[in-house]
Amino acid sequence: MKKIKIDVVALPLSGHLYPTMNLLAPLLQNPQYEIRLFTGPQKKAVTEAVGFQVLPILEGHVKEFEKAANNKEQLGIISAYRQLSASLDLINLVSDQLIQEWTNHCPDIAIVDFITLSGGLVAEQMGIPWITTMATQFAIETTDGSPCFFGGMGTPRNSWQVLQQFLARKITHLGKRIVTFLLRDRLRRYHFKLYSQKGQETIYSPYSILGIGMKEVELKRGFPKHYKWVGPSGASVEAVEDYPLDLSVFPNRKKVLVTCGTQLAWAKDNLLYQAKELAKAHPDCHFFVTRGVGGQPFKCENLMENLSVVSYLPYKEYIPQMDYVIHHGGAGIFYQCIIYGKPALILPHDYDQFDYAVRGVEAGVAFSAKRDSSKAIGQAFEELLAKENWPELETLRQAAQSYHPTEMLEREIHRLLEDKEKEK
């Protein structure tokens, strides 16, 4: 039987790379598939340990990538534009590598993370069927429902909020057109058009989009017909034995994980300060603050009797051992809390995190507070501790188990390849 050659393209950011890796990892044992993964050299070791054949991208440009990917403060309109502009040079470098590689070794299908623009742009140019994996399930524009990236718009409660959300969708549309116009010269090589004839964004696959998340918590409506929900798959992939933390020595305290992920370096000092304030007020809890620095020797420092700072903790292994989680609203940690039935306090910082926070609150699985307000955080944490029953969380925990991500991925792979055959 002829092998199906699959090339995966994802930036070396945990929140983007790991969900796509977890979708594909079960296929590594299937002799029907030949899978290669294009990602940054800084993630080469951890991806190879899972079993992927890795082709590094942006070798020699790690510093430039880290500078573009890790902003020094919360993004605004101007800083977001600058970040995108700086990223375009890197996007073109990756595109050049993909064109060269795919000219010599063309895959049958490409699977591309939703912000790794090079993969989709080049696949479309070369006539390669491709699938978008969307770790931020609501990033795509839709025809109805709460728009994202406006500070966390929830379900509209009145006609004014309905109008606000309508205008926000229009602003999103206009803003993207303006940015595309400003960058038109640098995008010319791709013959880039922002929207297709159907009015859908061309940076995502016109054939198949896999939403890595749960429809049950989504506030948007009007997704494209080729958008499929595959459930959450953003678990960490690091080996737990590399990050040894014995939680059995804290039997009489509530255990609380505190994290703002692997990015947001500018936010981590404030997070530690807020954790210290909570630790002072709650001696019956032990707080474990993770700095999100993986791939290095594990470190654990006890700053207070009931507060420990660790370099990194794989969520999949340690969240089940916690009682509560305080996090930033990243997609991965948001769903890990649901999967393991852990109530959360969300302190959104940037990007899509305000949108995940409002979804968590409306779903009844989390509280939320402003990240730099000790008073608001303290009050929200008191509410978190006081709430004894979490029926919505249990319902969603069970719903999360009903998804079959890899099965859906396989169906889409074969559907696209069959469609390609029909075109011949």
Feature-to-residue mapping (PLM):
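Active-site-proximal region of nucleotide-activated glycan assembly enzymes
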Residues: 131-219
